[in-house]
Amino acid sequence: GWVATSPLEVIAANMHQNLHTLALLDLDPTGEGIGHQIPLRPQDAVASLRLMWDKLADAIEEMPQETALQSMRVEACEALLSGDLDSMDVVLCSDMGTDDESLVATTVAQLEGQLGGRLNSLVFQSKTSEVEEKALLRWR
């Protein structure tokens, strides 16, 4: 089926510019907008990331590089793909603003084992400062 790579391209471009990325997980992973909608779970997000990773790796040679922005996006994607998806650091944020809120600092590989909550988001970390590292230790 069709797989969008734009979320992973944004993560790559942000990391290339040393920016963290907040990714809100879909409330309707089916995309149908009807029936019983179940929020995307952490393990679903990992499966989607793997599909995007593989498609981006296959399609990167075809990406346009006519403008500076397009060239930067390709360079950022190449840098991201030269690493390992499973070892990428990520923070799972679940049910923020409720009594059940939870933060878990983990990796993409370990994200599969996380239950998450009713509403989940992910923070993909770029380079972290000493203060940020100390904060992340609370959620490991």
Can you name each region flagged by the protein language model?
Residues G1-R140:
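Beta-strand/loop-alpha-helix module characteristic of Rossmann-like adenine-cofactor folds
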